[in-house]
Amino acid sequence: MLRLIMIVTALILLAAAEPEDCSWPDEHCNLFKTGQCCDRSMSCVVKNWKTVCSAGWFS
């Protein structure tokens, strides 16, 4: 289980190092290719010209 967590963490850090294209079906909302991909259960909010994921509509 710990190994899985480490792999997932490494993948997240790797993905954060470069702009994402939201190619997975359950990801969306990478406005201007400057923000991060959001899970479908989250909302996208634009802050400082970047797309960020938020659990609610306002953050």
Curated annotation (Swiss-Prot):
Originating species: Doratifera vulnerans
GO molecular function (one): toxin activity
GO terms under cellular component: extracellular region
Transmembrane region(s): none
Keyword flag Glycoprotein: no
Free-text comment about domains: The presence of a 'disulfide through disulfide knot' structurally defines this protein as a knottin.
Subcellular location: Secreted
Presence of the UniProt keyword Signal in the record: yes
Protein name: U-limacoditoxin(3)-Dv32a
Tissue: Expressed by the venom secretory cell of the spine. The spine is a cuticular structure containing a single large nucleated venom-secreting cell at its base. It is an independent unit capable of producing, storing and injecting venom. On the back of D.vulnerans caterpillars, spines are grouped together by 50 to 100 to form scoli, of which there are eight in D.vulnerans.
Function text: Probable toxin. Does not induce increase in intracellular calcium in mouse DRG neurons, suggesting that it does not induce pain.
